[in-house]
Amino acid sequence: MLSKEIIARLIETAKNYADNAYCPYSGVAVGAALLCSDNIILGGCNIETGDYAAPSFGAGDTAIAKAISEGYNQMLALCLYSKDRLVYPNATTRQYLCEFNGDMKIIVANDQTYEVIDRLGAIYLFPPAVGDGDQTGA
């Protein structure tokens, strides 16, 4: 269970990272805060590109990449923040989260409200993420 204090810290961190977003195409700035072991919180933001051959990066993706590159692979919760709407993890972020902890809490927040999703699998926006042991070679 995440305390209200931790949730507030995650939302504030994600909100601060949203200020750094590069989103000239969608206009939707998203920030992320990733709670890792030892209560370390790392952040990220979305980075868009106009080149169809080059991928854009979701805020969750950049936070996860930061965590892994800094040696944190025990992830406990992810918060995504956007000013006016609730933004859920994209398919790539969901896959990364499943690789490291498919049972982590997801917090989606905006300036008016927030929602805590108890388990990554509770988000049915995309087909199920490929988890450990699910790669059948098909």
Question: In which residue ranges do the predicted regions lie?
Answer:
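C-terminal binding/interaction regions
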Residues: M1-N20, E70-A138
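Short beta-strand scaffold segments in enzyme catalytic cores
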Residues: S26-C36
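Short, electropositive, low-hydrophobicity segments enriched in small/polar residues
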Residues: L35, A54, Q95
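Hydrophobic "anchor" residues
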Residues: I40-I41
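Compact, glycine-rich, soluble single-domain proteins
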Residues: C45-D61
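Feature captures the catalytic cores and cofactor-binding loops of soluble hydro-lyases/lyases
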Residues: G58, T62-E70
